[in-house]
From Swiss-Prot:
Keywords: Chaperone, Cytoplasm, Stress response. GO terms for biological process: protein folding. Residues 1-27 have a biased composition (Basic and acidic residues). One of its GO terms (molecular function) is unfolded protein binding. NCBIfam families: PRK14140.1, PRK14150.1. Residues 1-34 are annotated as: Disordered. It is found in: Cytoplasm. The gene is grpE. HAMAP family: GrpE. This is Protein GrpE. Its main location: cytoplasm.
Length: 197
């Protein structure tokens, strides 16, 4: 190659480089005119993705907290159900045994000739049986309600009648026709009573 050819080739290369630089400058100017800078665009996109990610994290944390609260509520309800089952599982049995208690009390209330030794020992046996039965049901949370002189409470007493009675204030129980019973504080049978008017 001759010097002339090399010189022409160098000039062409220089012109090409100038032309490329001019194009890049024009592209940058066009982008600047359009207001789109690739770096700014990338920064905006990253910020947008960060905001989306933050929102998703908040939603997931909220979901997690709600799930935990729901699990706690389910566990608490299950514990309460088990506790109620323990407390009141004997309710049907307790209601059924109340008739036996009533019958034993009626047997002891009947007039009898207690001078006869066999009748006296029979009454003593019934009395001991009743005491043992009452002690047993008491251990399981059954308690009697309805005592003469007590103030009438409609939650645990059922008034059969109201009559004026000397020696009693208004709303006091004058006669207990049938004892009532509670099982762990819950009424399983209200006491049937007469109340002073």
């Amino acid at each position: 190659m001759s010097n002339k050819e090399q010189h022409i080739e160098k000039e062409e290369q220089l012109q090409e480089e100038k032309h490329e630089e001019q194009q890049k400058t024009e592209e940058t100017e066009v982008e600047a005119v359009n207001g789109v800078d690739p770096l700014e665009e990338a920064i905006l996109r990253v910020q947008e993705l960060e905001a989306q990610l933050t929102e998703m994290v908040k939603k997931e944390q909220d979901f997690l907290l709600r799930s935990r609260a729901e699990m706690d509520n389910i566990r608490r309800r299950a514990e309460q159900d088990v506790e109620k089952a323990h407390k009141f599982g004997l309710e049907k049995f307790s209601k059924d045994i109340l008739n036996t208690i009533d019958n034993l009390e009626r047997a002891l209330a009947t007039p009898a000739n207690l001078e006869d030794e066999s009748i006296k020992s029979l009454f003593d046996g019934v009395e001991l049986t009743l005491k043992e039965l009452l002690a047993t049901v008491s251990r399981f949370g059954v308690e009697a309600v309805g005592v003469v002189g007590e103030t009438f409470n409609p939650e645990v007493h059922q008034a059969i009648s109201m009559q004026p009675m000397e020696g009693f204030e208004t709303n006091q129980i004058t006669v207990v026709l049938q004892k009532g019973y509670l099982l762990n504080g819950r009424v399983i049978r209200p006491a049937m009573v007469m109340v002073a008017a």
